[in-house]
A protein has these predicted regions:
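N-terminal pre-ligand scaffold of iron-sulfur
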Residues: 1-63, 89-107
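Short cysteine clusters
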Residues: 49, 68-71
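Short cysteine/histidine-rich metal-coordination sites, predominantly Zn2+-binding motifs
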Residues: 63-69, 82-91
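Iron-sulfur (Fe-S) cluster-binding segments and ferredoxin-like electron-carrier domains
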Residues: 55-62, 73-84
């Protein structure tokens, strides 16, 4: 789906998410984790590590990545791809800020 036909949904304020933290939203059967970095960048990933489906929302946010709490896989917040020697990826979603409102791209 391209940006012109993308459906944007407000999922709350950036102030609802602590720096280096996350919040989850439901989308059908899927849970999407919304992450906020220390420098207020916001990212969205399916809340499922590509290794053993661990809850990424419960991981540690650092350096543009999140570390899965189950087996310490490091996942890029931008792409959803595993870093280092690990292979696999989780779905990443487009996200933007409109003032302080987090807009999640679905489609």
């Amino acid at each position: 789906m391209n940006a012109l036909t993308q459906t944007w949904v407000s999922v709350g304020s950036i102030e609802d998410i602590p720096r280096r933290g996350s919040r989850c939203v439901g989308y059908g059967e899927m849970t999407i984790a919304i992450f906020r970095t220390i420098d207020d960048r916001v990212f969205a990933l399916e809340d499922k590590c590509p290794h053993k489906n661990g809850p990424l929302s419960q991981g540690i946010v650092h350096d543009g990545c999140v570390t899965c709490p189950l087996h310490s896989w490091v996942i890029s917040l931008e792409t959803g791809a595993a870093q280092g020697a690990d292979e696999g990826e989780t779905r990443a979603f487009p996200i933007r800020l409109d003032d302080d409102q987090i807009m999640l791209g679905l489609g």
